[in-house]
Curated annotation (Swiss-Prot):
Stated name of the protein: Meteorin-like protein
Protein's organism: Xenopus laevis (African clawed frog)
Glycan attachment residues as annotated in the record: 203
Single Gene Ontology MF annotation: hormone activity
Disulfide bonds: 28-51, 84-120, 165-235, 168-259, 178-281
Signal is among the record's keywords: yes
Amino acid sequence: MLRRGLLSFFMVILIDRGTSQLYSSDMCNWKGSGLTHEGHTKDVEQVYLRCSEGSVEWLYPTGAMVINLRPNTLTSAYKHLTVCIKPFKDSKGANIYSEKTGELKLVVPDGENNPHKVYCFGLDRGGLYIEATPQQDISRKITGFQYELISQRTLSDLHTVSDPCRPCSDTEVLLAVCISDFVVKGTISAVTNDEELQESLINVTVDKLYRQKSKIFLPKDNGGWEGMIRTPLECGVKTGMGSFLFTGRMHFGEPRLGCTPRYKDFKRIYLEAKKQGLNPCEISTD
């Protein structure tokens, strides 16, 4: 490798060849063209990104590249991160693999086109290896995706991504209330199931808005708030069923359902923890 330390925050070098390339890159996003790679199809490009979220866009892919993802704070904690990628609509022209010490595992095959599907794996597998597939005509071929790094030590993050239908433990509920992107008390007024995307879109009528980082829930004319949350279809969410405490995270710009206990159960859990001095944060239960 050529001076990896000097160039680690940007798209950097070719392995085996030192020809200069024209790319746009910052710490979070990378965009480049395979047209500058023609004639060097056996070269493997190295890209270094230092961000918790961003995007990669490879126009006219030829040859291969390795995407090295790390958080913007380099500590040993990066080994406990989950990488999630969401391919762009109509992304094509290359296979995407996870890579660990030379071993490749196919994550997204070329041509698999589901604009809402998200692929996740542990960062301890290493980087992403993207290999262009043989093409007679590379024009109009673009391989691209968004990525997010999610802490496996943050229980609400891990629950939302890896096992969204599993009921949360008391500890997970208490932590979710403190660190989720949205926390509301409300009821399920409608559920729309999308068989193609294998998702349910939950319409929530909100009685009490504790927190939201994005404008998920908007005021209603007759008081309260209303908004939509996504969850996998397999979770079997139904309308009615009483009052809940809804928590969750923004995931690729969409609100995803996290821990959602019945409100009466949350109130019991919270008050018991508070009595013992074990509640990680304060929240009104009136």
